[in-house]
């Protein structure tokens, strides 16, 4: 009976394409390509893609990458069995542009688009499925975790101008999932108006759409510095020790 309910639920869920942002410059890694760094003998990007491959809610994967990495990433997808990857496309001049280019290549069947940082290799299929399920209900959803440190606003010279209430702050993660037409319109608007956005939720918020947050995962960190890679290795080792 439980299996039957699962099949019915699967049949009714919307088609979801994951858009993987993998065209960054890795400037904070000292020129090293973060996505091709090995994490327990597997490239960071491949760990991210494997989680999307295993997530029941993801039907298709489109990757936006640097032009010089297109062939390598396509080859790695075949090597690691990323069968959901339909296309690897050239990224744009900014993250926003890259995600839009990937979105335009998504299947016409896609009702939801899930934007995933390529450099979040510890994201889990469980979290991915939870965010997609939330977005299917409300149209725009993302994972986030409470901010632990005290945050200060400062001037360009470093003078403190304020201390936001930490209880109202959240650190955003990915995947960030949206109705397909909504995300494409939001990204197009941000680009046309030359408005810098640091995540896809920001672009959607500009259009007046409410984005709902669900509990994220503290282990779902983004690899942007060598220290992040060291922490990720420790988390992965602990995960493997638990299994």
Regions found by a protein language model. Give the residues of each.
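N-terminal glycine-rich phosphate-binding loop and ensuing alpha1 helix
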Residues: 2, 7-70
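Residue-level signal for inorganic ion chemistry
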Residues: 20, 45, 102, 116-117, ...
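SAM-dependent methyltransferases
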Residues: 1-19, 23, 54, 199-201, ...
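Conserved core of the sugar-phosphate nucleotidyltransferase
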Residues: 122-214, 243
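Structural beta-sheet core signal
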Residues: 18-20, 63, 115, 140-143
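Acidic helix N-cap motif at the loop->helix transition within catalytic regions
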Residues: 71-76
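Active-site nucleotide-sugar/metal-binding loop of Leloir-type enzymes
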Residues: 97-112
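Conserved donor nucleotide-binding strand/loop of the catalytic core
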Residues: 80-93
């Amino acid at each position: 009976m439980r299996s039957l309910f699962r099949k019915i639920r699967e049949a009714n869920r919307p088609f979801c394409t994951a858009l993987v942002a993998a065209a960054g410059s890795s400037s904070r890694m000292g020129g090293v390509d973060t996505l091709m760094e090995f994490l327990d003998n597997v490239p960071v990007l491949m760990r991210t893609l494997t989680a999307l491959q295993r997530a029941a809610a993801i039907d298709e994967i489109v990757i936006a990458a640097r032009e010089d990495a297109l062939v390598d990433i396509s080859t790695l997808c075949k090597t690691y069995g990323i069968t959901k990857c339909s296309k690897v496309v050239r990224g744009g001049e900014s993250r926003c542009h890259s995600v839009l280019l990937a979105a335009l290549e998504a299947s016409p069947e896609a009702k939801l688009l899930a934007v995933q940082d390529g450099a979040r290799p510890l994201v889990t299929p469980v979290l991915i499925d939870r965010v997609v399920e939330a977005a299917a209900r409300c149209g725009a959803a993302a994972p986030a975790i409470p901010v632990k440190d005290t945050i200060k606003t400062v001037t360009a010279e470093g003078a403190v101008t304020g201390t936001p209430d930490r209880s109202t702050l959240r650190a955003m993660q990915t995947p960030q999932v949206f109705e397909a037409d909504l995300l494409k319109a939001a990204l197009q608007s941000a680009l046309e108006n030359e408005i810098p956005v640091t995540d896809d939720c920001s672009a959607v918020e500009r259009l007046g759409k409410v984005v709902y947050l669900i509990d994220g995962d503290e282990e779902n960190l983004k690899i942007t510095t060598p220290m992040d890679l060291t922490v990720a290795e420790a988390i992965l080792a602990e995960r493997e020790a638990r299994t």
